[in-house]
C-alpha cells in the first residue's frame, strides 16, 4: 500500500457535531514541533468523535509575522497570542491589529496580546487549558513547563531540557499536583508505548498482591515497596530501555573529519527537519545524550538500564527489552505529528495527518552500537544520568552556549562536547539542589563555557 496522508474523504468529519472542547496552549508555536502540533490539532478537530479541539493560546519569541500568520490560520483563533521577547511588543501589537482587519486571517480584535517571559507562565496555567504543548527550545522553556505541571495540566513534553535541568523537581511536582507528563520526543513516546505491557503487568501484580495479603496488611502497606529498584518497581519484567539514534549527518565520519566540519554540513540532517540548535545536537549526538538523561527522569530508571543504538532509517523509534529476552519496538514513519498526537489524545488513537509506511516496498531496518569514542557527548550523557543532581543543568547550559558559539563560527564542531565536559568538571556537584540553585548554576555554566571557548 503506497504511503499517503489522510484525506478529507477518508475519515468522518465531526465538526458539525456537538462535542466538549479540549483546549490546548502551544508554547513554541513557530518552531518545527509547534507547527506540527497546530496541524495535528486542526486535524483532530475534524476527525475526533469525542472532542472538539481548539488552540487557546500560542507563543513565539521574536518571529512575529509567522506567529500571527499561524494564529490567523486556526479554525478557531486563539484568544491570546504570546510574544516572550518583551522588546517585540510594539511590532507584535501592530501585526495583530493589521491581521484582525484582513479577510485572509481569522483573527479578530478579541484576540489579545500578552508579552514577556511571565506571559508564557500565564498561558500555561489558564484555568480552561487542558493540555500544554511544551515546545520551547532549550532552558527557556523550563519555567512555563514547570508552571503547567504545578497547575496539574497534561503536558505534551517536547522540551527535553526541562527534565535535563530540573528532572527531580519536575517529576516530584507532577506527582504532587496530579499532572501528566507525556513525551513528544519520538524516542520517549516510543518507549512509553512499548511499556504498555509492563504497565498492565504492574496493575495486575498490585491487584494480585493485595488480594493475597491479610486485611490488616492491606490497610497499611502500598502494593509495592518504593525501596525496590525503580526498574523493577515501576516496570515489572523490563530489562532495559533502548533509544534509537539516526546517527545524524556525521554518522560515518571520523573524528578528524568532524574536526573540520562546517556549519552547513552539521545542519544537513539526513532524516528530520528541525531547528538549528537541535540539528547541531543531533550531529554531535548531544541530543541523544540529553534524551538518556530525560529517559532516566521520565521513566524513573537508572542509567545502566538505558542503551543507545544507531538506526539510520529512523523507522524504529525505540525498543524495550524484557527479562525473557523479548523486544518490543515502536515503528512508524519519521513524522513528529505521530508522537505529538499520541501525547494529546492518549490513550486514544485516532487518524493522524502523517503518511503511512509504504508497505508495498521492502523495509530496510538496521541497528548497530553507538560509538562513544567518536561521539563523546553520548558518554557524557550517561555520566550525567548516573550522577544526577546539578550535572544536568551545567551540561545543558554549557551545550546551549557551545552550540551558539559554533553556529557563529567561533569554535570547531568538536569543541562542543569538550567545552561541556570541562564545564562539568569545573563545577561543585550537588546531589539535591533546589530549583533556585539550578537556575544560578545555569547562569554560571554559560559564562564558564564562554571562558573555556577563549582559552
Swiss-Prot record:
Annotated organism of origin: Rhodopirellula baltica (strain DSM 10527 / NCIMB 13988 / SH1)
Xref: PANTHER family: 1-DEOXY-D-XYLULOSE 5-PHOSPHATE REDUCTOISOMERASE (PTHR30525), 1-DEOXY-D-XYLULOSE 5-PHOSPHATE REDUCTOISOMERASE, CHLOROPLASTIC (PTHR30525:SF0)
NCBIfam families: Dxr (TIGR00243)
Gene of this entry: dxr
Binding site for NADPH: 30-33, 63, 159, 161, 275
Pathway the protein contributes to: Isoprenoid biosynthesis; isopentenyl diphosphate biosynthesis via DXP pathway; isopentenyl diphosphate from 1-deoxy-D-xylulose 5-phosphate: step 1/6
GO biological-process terms attached to the record: isopentenyl diphosphate biosynthetic process, methylerythritol 4-phosphate pathway involved in terpenoid biosynthetic process
Region (Disordered): 205-233
HAMAP family the record matches: DXP_reductoisom (MF_00183)
Protein name in the entry: 1-deoxy-D-xylulose 5-phosphate reductoisomerase
Residues the record lists as binding Mn(2+): 185, 187, 291
Catalytic activity: 2-C-methyl-D-erythritol 4-phosphate + NADP(+) = 1-deoxy-D-xylulose 5-phosphate + NADPH + H(+)
Biased composition (Polar residues): 205-214
A single MF term (Gene Ontology): NADPH binding
